Each structure stands twice: as structure tokens, then as C-alpha cells.
From Swiss-Prot:
PANTHER family: THREONINE--TRNA LIGASE 2, CYTOPLASMIC (PTHR11451:SF38), THREONINE-TRNA LIGASE (PTHR11451). GO terms for molecular function: ATP binding; threonine-tRNA ligase activity. It comes from Xenopus tropicalis (Western clawed frog). This is Threonine--tRNA ligase 2, cytoplasmic. The lineage of its organism: Eukaryota, Metazoa, Chordata, Craniata, Vertebrata. Residues 172-234 form the TGS domain. GO terms for biological process: threonyl-tRNA aminoacylation. Residues 62-142 are annotated as: Disordered. It is an enzyme of class 6 (ligase). It comes from the Eukaryota. It holds the Pfam family tRNA_SAD. Belongs to the class-II aminoacyl-tRNA synthetase family. Residues 63-72, 88-102, 119-137 have a biased composition (Basic and acidic residues). HAMAP family: Thr_tRNA_synth (MF_00184). Gene3D superfamilies: 3.10.20.30, Anticodon-binding domain (3.40.50.800), Bira Bifunctional Protein, Domain 2 (3.30.930.10), Threonyl-trna Synthetase, Chain A, domain 2 (3.30.980.10).
């Protein structure tokens, strides 16, 4: 190998000499004078090739040195095993390493396989060795860390010198306006938000997570550059939480890099916490490793490593991260600017927009609680990554509350409730497709009937459309270009067909199958058709992520003048439905994404209409820039459940694109037959399956009476009352209720009542000889409230009234 590299090196050096001679020849021909003002293309190309070859030579020289080092006789009588020589450690520690499958004789730290970044990894570091003054606690410290830090330090010194020069020569007085309107004086390129916070109070400065400068999140130690409006955000701000958890992800990334030695990928904050993905080349992550990872994180926190921001050119970053193909992909595919930013904490340097907390010591308590496998960017044809999840807080009290919340959420898990209450199940022979049992089907049908009843009130027309379409339909709609990977497709008679993942193109065919008049608009099509989406098997999760589902899907075809009224109607519709469930909600306006279809003027008009509707609705709303669908802006609605979690279900989308793609027209009042309608995509429940999961967990299996799968349990006092109990059950069932009768003679009366209460039966009707004689029932609830004896006919009428009203507390109101 060394001989091969040396041979390549000789060839490259000869090529450079040839290029230098050619450059000299061109310069002698008189081109030198024109280079400064109008460079000769041939000369410039030769120079570029020259620079590339110099870089290759540098790389080959480094590779040659490393190959020669590896070629030296190994310590175990085998050539080339220098890197694999075991680290000398106390015997006890070495045994622990063996137990955990860490680096031992002839192996590295990743289960005996080459490290994910082995091609750029130098001698495996001894546990506890320092790199640039930072102690590496893990079983390995990859060699690329040292090279990465060396380049970073050079660039950081240049950056600091530039910043010092700006502070010395460009600084000027600035006005800093605080959130309360108060103004303080500062100096550009010198005054930082942290200094502003200190000027107010030390307590404030200690509790501030991040600053917001002129509506942009800003590092606390980053100097202000001009007159600024400054907000100081604490952890109770959602934006501050995202920053806090993002910084925590970097701590986890530093730990994973040193512990596993793999290639870091993405490490973002999420709704509750953070995660980091790492490529480990086939090696997995074990929960047994969590304590070691947490201890390393605690050590990093204790060091109070500062977060440093540095803007670097893309070319230099490709050099800095050459050991990591994933970071290079991000740079090549995602970064379209000449420069971007990296952040450093300790030995970790990572591509990152930031901002971050001041130092790692701001993370007071951190817990690693879960791991999973995923694909690079969610694509099944790409590399498998290992993902580790964590959570962190600024005090231990919040961590304790979070742990209690997790326990409560675990008890409310819809998969557990579905199993315990016999609502539904899944099977490997149809992954991602739910089997709803009778009780689950009752919930499903009750929800759809609820929405259908609202359709009658709000003048929606229910339709039914095909499940399978020729791919030409999806090409026409634009979905084939943007969404075909998520569709189930197949060949029929040499034509490609696909199961529909949404209803809108079919509804466009229904609108356009005959001429339409302005008198028909608005035309509101509603459809509960079955939809299929080819979700990756690794992402399937109970009812929240499925392949087969139904939506309360509707599309409103209207004129431009009708948009405002229709949008208001949609918002009022969702408000009335969520009120029944007891949900509060948040509204988010999602605007034009990068991959949008259509003209920007149409997008601007659509966004303006949605904003106007939201303002008129009167509820608070937030802007979510760039998160709209590719065919139009939308309003996303997030509901809040009983334990404080948010879920996105409803959506309202304005679409100017599909009417154009399907050439939909109507005849206007003045006779113009080329007028284009507007489409409003609308769903309230969203996926019925997902809504059932949310309701399961929201109610904790304690269903409200109108929706409950076990509304009435009839219990006879003794065998002599069995026949009457069965008749009562039959009458209640025929009146439209989910009714059962307990005829188990092995249980006492009290045991039967207790079983019914534990099964969350809303009402328990006890019948004995007296009730049998009087055609009555003795009513009690699952919460053991006794309503006493009442005629069966009266009881059924009361139950009907409570069901019709969809009462939240029917048991109390009976």
C-alpha cells in the first residue's frame, strides 16, 4: 500500500512540474500583463489544476506517512496492527471494556468493526486522554478531532483578530431598546446581550437562555452590530427551550463522538428534548450504555465549555469535515451560500446555524432516555443511523416533573389502552393497517357520524370516489413528481396505477366532469374514502403513523369573493368540534416553501387571504414561514390534550394550483366561462385513526359517554334475575347503546360492579327482584355515584338525551 501511494505521489509531482513549466511558457508569451485585469482562461484553468494537484499531494503525503506508521512491526508479531494494539489500562477497567464490547485486543470501540470514520481516524486514544485541553472520558477519542481542532483554531484566531479590529476601528454608540421599551446605551461590535442583562440584574443574567435581537435569535456573547431591539428569553419561552435543547444536543454529540467514534449526522431540538443521529456502520446502541453516556455528559457540563460561533467558507468546511461524508453531503446539498456557521463546545465542532447557550454549564440536568434506528434523511435506500434521545432542564424540579409526566403518558399509551379495552390490534401480515374490533369500530363510526351530522348542518355534500387511479392523474396533479415515493403503485396491462394517498385530485375530476355555474358555488365535497401512504416500516407507530387510514376530508370549490366567508366557516367548524372533545388549540399560518408550485403573486394573494381570515377569527395565531404545502399556504391546527401535549390534526389549505393543473372553470354571473375556482382543502379530525389515538390518551381510556365503547353494563343480583337482565341489555342495545350483561355466577355482586368500574363502563344497571317487578333498574356510575332506582324506559330516555348532547360529564348529569 505504501509503495502504491509513493508511486502515485511521484506521478502527481511530475504533473505539477509540467503544469508549472506550461504556466511559465504562457507568461513568457506576454500573457503576464493581462492576467491582473483580464485573466487568460487557459492560464486560469492550469492554475486551478495546479492547486488541486497540490492539495492531492498534501493528502497523499499525509496518507503515506500514516501508512508507513501502520506498516511498522506490531506489538503482537503481526505487521500493521499498531492501531489495534490494546490500550494499557488497569486490569479491572479492561474487563469492564470487554463486558461492554468496547475496544479490546484487535478491536476498536465499535463492536470490533472499523469505525464509521476509520479512513480519517488516527491512533485510537486512550480513555481519559486530553485533546486540546479537554479530557476525553469515552473509550475512544477519534483522531479526526485533533485535525479538526487545529484547523478551527487557525480560523478562530483570524476571526478574533477581525472582531478586535472592528471593535477598535468600527465601533460606534448604539441604542438598545428592551422589551419593556426602556433604552440603554451600548457600542457596536463590543456590547453583548449578556452585558445588557448584567446591567439589569445578575439574577436575570443567570436565568436568561438566549437573546432575540431585532426579532432574530442571538447568542448572548455575540456583540451587537447596530441599534437593536433586544429581548432576553428565559426557559419558559418556547424559542428559548428550543435553543436550550439544541445546546444539549451538542453535548450529547460530543459524548457520542468520543464514546462511539462514529460520524455525527443531525442533532436538532424537538418538541420535548433533542436527539443526535450517528452512523456506526452496522453497530447498534444499547440502553446499557446510557449511564456511561450520561456520566460523560455530566463531565462536559461541569467543564462549562463555552459555545463559540464561527462563520467559515464552504470550501474550508469541506476540508474540516472531510472525515464525515454526511456533513459533506449537508454542505454540498443544503448550503447554497459561500459561507456558513459552525459552533464549538470543547472538542466538538459542528455545522450549525445556532444560536446556543453561553456554555455547557447552563444545562443543569440531562437525561438520556431512548434510542432507535433511522435512515439518513428518512430514506430507506440510504444508510442506517443510530439515534439517541435526551431531555434536559435548568433545574432538577422540572426534570422530576418530566419523569412523572412520562410515567403518566406511558400509562395512557393508546396501544396499551387499545389492547386492554379490546379496541384494535395490528398484525405483521398487514403492517401499518389497523384491525378495529367491535368496540374500536364503535368509536370509529361514532366519530365519523359526528362529522357527518355537522356536514348536514353546514351544507357539505358527501361523495364517494375511487381508491385506484392511473398515474397520469397524479402527474396532472403534481403529486407524482413530489410524492410518488410515498404511494403504493403497481402495473396493470402495462399502465401504472396507484392507491390514492389523498382525495383532492379525484374531487377535481368530479368538479370538472361537467360545466359548472357560479350558482353552484361554493361546492363542498366531503369524502371518507380510504387512503394509503407508503410510510417506512421503521416509522410506523400504533395509530399515530399508519399506512391505511381515513380522513374527514373535504374540498370547497369557491370563487375569490367567497374565500373569506368559507375560511371563517372552516375555523368555526373546527372550534365547535374541538369544544366537544374539550381541546384547546393553537393556530399556525404556514407559508410558501422552497419547492412551491405556481406563481409567486398567486401565493402572496393566498397568504394574504388566510391571514385576514385568522385575524377575523379572533384567536391568537403564529407564523410558520416556509412550511406550507407545495401547492398552497395552509393553516395548521395543533390541539392540546389533557396532559399538555400538542398534536396536529386539522388543516385548512388554500389552493390556487390544482384548478389550473386540472383546467377547472365555471361560468361567471356575467357569462365568462373561463373563470377559475379556488379550492380549500379542509379536515377537522384529520386521520380518524390518529384522532382515536389522541382521544385514547387524552381520556386515559375513560371515555365520555357519547363516545364510549362500553356505555352500559347490566348486572343481575342473582341467577333468578338473569333473564330480566338479558332483556334489559337487549332493550338498551336496541336503543342505540353499547350494552353488555355480566352473567358470571362465580363472581359476587360487588366483584361484578368493581369489574365494570375498572372496565370504564359509564353506567352500571343493577337488577334484582324489585327492579324486575317494577320494570326498573338501579343506576350507578363507574365513579361509584349511586343514582338509585328508575324505570327502564326513563333511564333509556335520559341516556339518549345525554348521548345527543355529547355531554362531557354524563355520569354526573344523569
Amino acid at each position: 500500500m505504501a509503495a502504491h501511494i509513493a508511486q502515485r505521489l511521484t506521478v502527481q509531482e511530475q504533473e505539477i512540474r509540467r503544469l508549472n513549466e506550461e504556466i511559465g511558457r504562457l507568461l513568457e508569451l506576454g500573457l503576464q500583463g493581462s492576467v491582473e485585469h483580464s485573466p487568460n482562461p487557459v492560464l486560469e484553468q492550469l492554475r486551478a489544476e495546479n492547486e488541486k494537484l497540490k492539495y492531492r499531494i498534501s493528502h497523499l503525503q499525509r496518507s503515506l506517512r500514516e501508512e508507513q506508521e501502520r506498516a511498522r512491526p506490531g506489538q503482537y508479531g503481526e505487521p500493521g496492527l499498531k492501531d489495534a494494539a490494546p490500550v494499557e489500562e488497569p486490569k479491572q477497567q479492561n474487563n469492564k471494556a470487554k463486558e461492554k464490547g468496547q475496544a479490546t485486543k484487535g478491536e476498536n470501540s465499535v463492536g470490533g468493526k472499523p469505525s464509521a470514520c476509520e479512513g480519517n481516524k488516527k491512533n485510537e486514544k486512550k480513555a481519559g486522554k486530553e485533546v486540546d485541553g479537554h479530557k476525553q472520558e469515552g473509550p475512544c477519542a477519534p483522531g479526526f478531532i485533533k485535525d479538526r481542532l487545529a484547523l478551527y483554531e487557525t480560523l478562530k484566531n483570524e476571526h478574533d483578530a477581525l472582531l478586535a479590529a472592528r471593535a477598535a476601528h468600527q465601533s460606534k454608540p448604539i441604542k438598545i431598546t428592551l422589551a419593556d421599551g426602556k433604552q440603554v446605551d451600548g457600542e457596536s461590535w463590543k456590547t453583548t446581550p449578556y452585558q445588557v442583562a448584567i446591567g439589569i440584574s445578575k439574577g436575570l443574567a443567570d436565568n436568561v437562555v438566549i437573546a432575540k435581537v431585532n426579532n432574530e435569535l442571538w447568542d448572548l456573547d455575540r456583540p451587537l452590530e447596530q441599534d437593536s431591539n433586544v429581548e432576553l428569553l428565559k426557559f419558559d419561552s418556547e424559542e428559548a427551550q428550543a435553543v436550550y435543547w439544541h445546546s444539549s444536543a451538542h453535548i450529547l454529540g460530543e459524548t457520542m463522538e468520543n464514546f462511539y467514534g462514529g460520524c455525527l449526522c443531525y442533532g436538532p431540538p424537538i418538541e420535548n428534548g433533542f436527539y443526535y443521529d450517528m452512523y456506526l456502520d452496522g453497530r447498534g446502541v444499547s440502553s446499557n450504555e446510557f449511564p456511561s453516556l450520561e456520566n460523560m455528559c455530566k463531565a462536559i457540563i461541569k467543564e462549562k465549555q463555552p459555545f463559540e460561533r464561527l462563520e467559515v467558507s464552504k470550501d474550508l468546511l469541506l476540508e474540516m469535515f472531510k472525515y464525515n461524508k454526511f456533513k459533506c453531503r449537508i454542505l454540498n446539498e443544503k448550503v447554497d451560500t459561500p459561507t456558513t456557521t459552525v459552533y464549538r463546545c470543547g472538542p466538538l465542532i459542528d455545522l450549525c446555524r445556532g444560536p446556543h447557550v453561553r456554555h455547557t454549564g447552563k444545562i443543569k440536568t440531562l437525561k438520556i432516555y431512548k434510542n432507535s434506528s433511522t435512515y439518513w434523511e428518512g430514506r430507506a435506500d440510504m444508510e442506517t443511523l443510530q439515534r439517541i434521545y435526551g431531555i434536559s432542564f435548568p433545574d432538577s424540579k422540572l426534570m422530576k416533573e418530566w419523569e412523572q409526566f412520562q410515567e403518566e403518558a406511558k400509562n395512557r399509551d393508546h396501544r396499551k389502552i387499545g389492547r386492554d379495552q379490546e379496541l384494535f390490534f395490528f398484525h405483521d401480515l398487514s403492517p401499518g393497517s389497523c384491525f378495529f374490533l367491535p368496540r374500536g369500530a364503535h368509536i370509529y363510526n361514532t366519530l365519523t357520524d359526528f362529522i357527518k351530522g355537522e356536514y348536514q348542518i353546514r351544507n357539505f355534500t358527501e361523495v364517494a370516489s375511487p381508491n385506484i387511479y392511473n398515474s397520469k392523474l397524479w402527474e396532472m396533479s403534481g403529486h407524482w413528481q413530489h410524492y410518488s415515493e410515498n404511494m403504493f403503485s403497481f402495473e396493470v396491462e402495462k399502465e401504472t396505477f396507484a392507491l390514492k394517498p389523498m382525495n383532492c385530485p379525484g374531487h377535481c375530476l368530479m368538479f370538472g366532469h361537467r360545466p359548472r355555474s357560479w350558482r353552484e358555488l361554493p361546492l363542498r365535497f366531503a369524502d371518507f374514502g380510504v387512503l394509503h401512504r407508503n410510510e417506512l416500516s421503521g416509522t410506523l407507530s400504533g395509530l399515530t403513523r399508519v399506512r391505511r387510514f381515513q380522513q374527514d376530508d373535504a374540498h370547497i370549490f369557491c370563487t375569490m369573493d367567497q374565500i373569506q366567508e368559507e375560511m371563517n366557516g372552516c375555523l368555526q367548524f373546527l372550534q365547535s368540534v374541538y369544544k366537544v372533545f374539550g381541546f384547546t388549540f393553537q393556530l399556525h399560518l404556514s407559508t410558501r416553501p422552497e419547492n412551491y408550485l405556481g406563481e409567486i403573486e398567486i401565493w402572496n394573494e393566498a397568504e394574504k387571504q388566510l391571514e385576514s381570515s385568522l385575524n377575523q377569527f379572533g384567536e391568537p395565531w403564529k407564523l410558520n414561514p416556509g412550511d406550507g404545502a407545495f401547492y398552497g399556504p395552509k393553516i395548521d391546527i395543533k390541539i392540546k390534550d389533557a396532559i399538555g401535549r400538542y398534536h396536529q390534526c386539522a388543516t385548512i389549505q388554500l389552493d390556487f394550483q390544482l384548478p389550473i393543473r386540472f383546467n377547472l372553470t365555471y361560468v361567471s354571473k356575467d357569462g365568462d366561462d373561463k373563470k377559475r375556482p379556488v379550492i380549500i382543502h379542509r379536515a377537522i379530525l384529520g386521520s380518524v385513526e390518529r384522532m382515536i389515538a389522541i382521544l385514547c390518551e387524552n381520556y386515559g381510556g375513560k371515555w365520555p359517554f357519547w363516545l364510549s365503547p362500553r356505555q352500559v353494563m347490566v348486572i343481575p343480583v342473582g341467577p333468578s334475575c338473569d333473564e330480566y337482565a338479558q332483556q334489559v341489555c337487549k332493550d338498551v342495545f336496541e336503543a342505540g347503546f353499547m350494552a353488555e350483561v355480566d352473567l358470571d355466577h362465580s363472581c359476587t355482586l360487588n366483584k361484578k360492579i368493581r369489574n365494570a368500574q375498572l372496565a370504564q363502563c359509564n353506567f352500571i344497571l343493577v337488577v334484582g327482584e324489585k327492579e324486575k317487578t317494577d320494570s326498573a333498574v338501579n343506576v350507578r356510575t363507574r365513579d361509584n355515584k349511586v343514582h338509585g332506582e328508575i324505570l327502564l324506559t326513563s333511564a333509556i330516555e335520559k341516556l339518549k338525551t345525554l348521548k345527543k348532547l355529547r355531554s362531557k360529564n354524563a355520569e354526573e348529569e344523569f
